[in-house]
Every structure is written in C-alpha cells, then in structure tokens.
Amino acid sequence: MNISIISVGKLKEKYLKQGIAEYTKRLGAYAKIELIEVPDEKAPEQLSDTEMEHVKQKEGERILAKLHPDTYVIALAIEGSMKSSEELADTMDRLATYGKSKVAFVIGGSLGLSDAVLKRADEKLSFSKMTFPHRLMRLILLEQVYRAFRINRGEPYHK
C-alpha cells in the first residue's frame, strides 16, 4: 500500500520531525510512506471570513494538485466521523482488500480544509472534537496508522 500524508505548512519543530521520522521508519515495514508538504498561504493574523475562505481555497488548490485521480482520500476534519484504533485498522484492511493501493490522508492548515478538498475526500476522519495543532496531527496520525498495521497483523504494540 502507498500512503501519502499531505499537509499544509513546513514542519519546523525538531521534536515533531524526530517523532515523524521514527514512525515513518517503522511504517516502512508495512507500506510505502510519502510525506508531502504544500506551502501555507501567507496571511495576516486577523482575517475576514472572505479572506479566510481565500486562504483555504489557495491551500486547497495546492493539496488537490498532489492527489492522483485513483487515490482514496481521507480528510482529517473536525466534522468527520470518529473511529477507534480498531476501526481505523478495519478501514485500512478494507482498503487493501478492495485494491485501494493509494491512500492519502490530508491535513489542512490552521484554518482547516477548503470545500473543494472536503468534496474530493472519500472519507472524513476526526480524531476528536478538540482542535489540535495541524503540525502535531502529522505525528498523531502516523502513530495511529502504524498502530492499525500492527493490529491487522496481530503484532504486539496495541493497548
């Protein structure tokens, strides 16, 4: 399986880079992992609703440009469905079983994802009703994908 993590913005924090590198390495035994960063749209601190939509649209265009037509897209969105680790493992197993060899998880910028990206998504996934920093979500997501593969293989790690 080829898994892409498409996220907005460049990762700067060393501790996050180290954690992401560790889980990317671990996942290499199960899947080909590609981490794709698209530039965030530069904007002032205070934005009108129109300006916020413009920023999301620009970032969304960059995300959509990275998606292949045959890729199964899972958008991380607060309005998405919540799953347990076991349910995410079932989703990953189902995708593999039905021949979905390309899966992309999409993480938006600080303002979220554009409507166009959400429409392109085959599934919307929420990790919580709480808001997490989008850069931290990369690490959390990779850990959960790793956990899903371990669960599906019946390997120790889970719990």
Swiss-Prot record:
Gene: rlmH
Family named by the database record: Belongs to the RNA methyltransferase RlmH family.
Known function: Specifically methylates the pseudouridine at position 1915 (m3Psi1915) in 23S rRNA.
GO MF assignments: rRNA (pseudouridine-N3-)-methyltransferase activity
GO CC, any one term: cytoplasm
Principal place of residence: cytoplasm
Compartments where located: Cytoplasm
Biological source species: Halalkalibacterium halodurans (strain ATCC BAA-125 / DSM 18197 / FERM 7344 / JCM 9153 / C-125)
Name this protein carries in UniProt: Ribosomal RNA large subunit methyltransferase H
EC number: 2.1.1.177
Subunit note: Homodimer.
Residues annotated for S-adenosyl-L-methionine binding in this entry: L76, G108, F127, S128, K129, M130, T131, F132
UniProt entry keywords in alphabetical sequence: Cytoplasm, Methyltransferase, rRNA processing, S-adenosyl-L-methionine, Transferase
Bilayer-spanning residue ranges: none
InterPro entries, A to Z: Alpha/beta_knot_MTases, RlmH-like, tRNA_m1G_MTases_N
Catalytic reaction(s) noted: pseudouridine(1915) in 23S rRNA + S-adenosyl-L-methionine = N(3)-methylpseudouridine(1915) in 23S rRNA + S-adenosyl-L-homocysteine + H(+)
EC supergroup of this enzyme: transferase
Family matches, as SUPFAM superfamilies: alpha/beta knot (SSF75217)
